Amino acid sequence: MPDAEQLPDGWEKRTSRSTGMSYYLNMYTKESQWDQPTEPAKKAGGGSAGGGDAPDEVHCLHLLVKHKGSRRPSSWREANITRTKEEAQLLLEVYRNKIVQQEATFDELARSYSDCSSAKRGGDLGKFGRGQMQAAFEDAAFKLNVNQLSGIVDSDSGLHIILRKA
């Protein structure tokens, strides 16, 4: 049985914010597990051609449209958001199409229409790693290629479109 204080190389012990339980984070791949590791952490890709080349961090912009079912249905733009989820989706579809058709830039639309305070930076969230964003948002962001625009992503905060920059 491994010693509780001594972890193999590449692992870090953390505490879950939602459950208060300890978990273990692979510092190379940012994957986590509940069971205490007994072997050194594997590095991203593992050297095999099909092993994937998952980044440690991504740099993304996003445009958030909140709806009345959002976790906090208010924003810097509106004190009380009353639109439905369906209305939010229609708005995002219009914004996404404008970007794809090159009728507007992501930066312009985020500054004008995003319900996130990052709107002031054109939706720029900067770089972030695994475990820093809501799971649905994070999963979508890490699946994107550089300069790829996501479809509509549903999170507790509302609906998003995401543009990965790095």
Swiss-Prot record:
SMART domains: WW. PROSITE patterns: PPIC_PPIASE_1, PPIC_PPIASE_2, WW_DOMAIN_1, WW_DOMAIN_2. Its EC number is 5.2.1.8. Residues 55-166 form the PpiC domain. It is an enzyme of class 5 (isomerase). Keywords: Isomerase, Rotamase. One of its GO terms (biological process) is regulation of locomotor rhythm. Pfam families: Rotamase (PF00639), WW (PF00397). GO terms for molecular function: DNA-binding transcription factor binding; peptidyl-prolyl cis-trans isomerase activity. It catalyses: [protein]-peptidylproline (omega=180) = [protein]-peptidylproline (omega=0). It comes from the Eukaryota. One of its GO terms (cellular component) is nucleus. Residues 44-53 have a biased composition (Gly residues). Residues 32-53 are annotated as: Disordered. Residues 5-39 form the WW domain. InterPro entries: PPIase_dom_sf (IPR046357), PPIase_Pin1 (IPR051370), PPIase_PpiC (IPR000297), PPIase_PpiC_CS (IPR023058), WW_dom (IPR001202), WW_dom_sf (IPR036020). This is Putative peptidyl-prolyl cis-trans isomerase dodo. It comes from Drosophila melanogaster.
